[in-house]
Amino acid sequence: MRIINIKEIIKTVKELSIEANYYLPDDIKEAIEKAEKNEKWPIANNILNKIIENSHIAAREKIPICQDTGMACVFVDIGQDVHIIGGNLEEAINEGVRQGYEEGFLRKSVVKDPLHRVNTNDNTPALIYYNIVPGDKVKIMVSPKGFGSENMSRIAMLKPSDGLEGVKNFVLETVRIAGPNPCLLYTSPSPRDT
C-alpha cells in the first residue's frame, strides 16, 4: 500500500489549476494549427491564427488563455492500493483549486447558489469526478469549464426509434446553432501522477 500525504494533492491541484488556464495541451494546439493550415476561408483562418497567437502569448507571459477561467473540473483516478493521509481528499482538492486560482491570478466566478448569485471568491467548490482504478497511484487532471461553453449546451428527449442517427443529428444541429460562440474545451496539459 502506498501512502500519499494530502499536501501532495493540494500542491498538484494548485499547479494543474494554473497550468490548465495558461497552456493549451499539445493535442489541442496541434489540432488548431492543422485546422488553420487547411482552412481556406480567410475569416476562419484569421480566427484560428488569433487563437494560436493568443495561446503563445498566454504561455510566454504566464497569463490565462481566456478571461473566463471557468469552474475547475477535477478528474481523479485513485489506485485502490493508495492510502491518503493528513486530511480529507475533497477538501484538499478544493484547497488546491483555491490556491491555484489565487496564485495564478485567475478570475473567481463560482457562486455558492445559482439562485442567490453569491460568489465564493475562491472558485470553489470544484466539480470532482472520482474513478477507482487498480494500482498505487493517484492521477489528477484539471479542466476549467468556461461558462460560455455551458451557455451553448442543449438537451433533447429523443425517441428510441431515432437511434444513433438521431443522436448524431442532434449533436450536429447543436454545433450548427451554437456556431462560433462556445469556448474551446481544454484541460491541464498533462494529467499528473502523485
Label each PLM-derived region with a short phrase.
Residues 186-193:
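Conserved small/polar residues in nucleotide/adenosyl-binding loops
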